[in-house]
Each structure stands twice: as C-alpha cells, then as structure tokens.
C-alpha cells in the first residue's frame, strides 16, 4: 500500500515539473486579462500610449492596451508563485 502511495506522489511531482516547464514562458488567460485591464486603466487615467495610436482602427483604451500587449512593449513583469514556494518572474517586454 505504501509503495503505491509513493508511486502516486512521484507521478504527481513529475506532472508538476512538466506543467511548470510548459507554462514557464507562457501566460494564462487570466494573467493576460489582468495585464490588459491594468494597462487600460492606466491609459484611461492619462498615461501616454507606448505605441503610435494614429494607425489603429479603434482608439479606445482596451484596444490600445491589447495592441501594446501584442507588440510586446509593456514594461510589466509578472510574479508567479508556484505551490512549492518557487517564484518565477515573467517580463512582458520583448527584446
């Protein structure tokens, strides 16, 4: 019985390592929504746009924030806490 439990724990640890390696450089839909909404709020409060908005078809703050996110010009870093206590920092700015 104890051996089966150890095998299950070993499989769970392996799954967690694979999951972390797959998602380490990708954002979840919730992180993307949070970043875009935070940037849209900044724009609505008067922050300057980081892209040229004259070429955009729509100039509402959410469209501008989405385009800034797509182009990778946002100077935002996401701190992701993992269940094992490890912290991963993800920069949204593309080099």
Swiss-Prot record:
**Does the keyword section mention Nucleotidyltransferase?**
yes
Provide the reaction this enzyme catalyses: RNA(n) + a ribonucleoside 5'-triphosphate = RNA(n+1) + diphosphate
One biological process GO term for this chain?
A: transcription by RNA polymerase I
| Keywords in alphabetical order | Cytoplasm, DNA-directed RNA polymerase, Nucleotidyltransferase, Transcription, Transferase
Write out the annotated subcellular location: Cytoplasm
Checking Pfam families in the record gives: RNA_pol_Rpb6
SMART domains according to UniProt: RNA_pol_Rpb6
For the protein in the UniProt heading, the enzyme class is: transferase
Homology family: Belongs to the archaeal Rpo6/eukaryotic RPB6 RNA polymerase subunit family.
Q: What is this protein called?
A: DNA-directed RNA polymerase subunit Rpo6
Annotated gene: rpo6
């Amino acid at each position: 019985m104890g051996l089966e439990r150890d095998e299950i724990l070993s499989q769970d640890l392996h799954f967690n390592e694979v999951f972390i390696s797959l998602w380490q450089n990708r954002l979840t839909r919730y992180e993307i929504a949070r970043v875009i909404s935070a940037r849209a709020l900044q724009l609505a409060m008067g922050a300057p746009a980081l892209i040229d908005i004259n070429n955009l078809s729509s100039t509402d703050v959410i469209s501008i924030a989405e385009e800034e996110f797509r182009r990778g010009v946002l100077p935002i870093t996401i701190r992701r806490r993992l269940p094992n206590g490890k912290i991963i920092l993800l920069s949204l700015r593309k080099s």
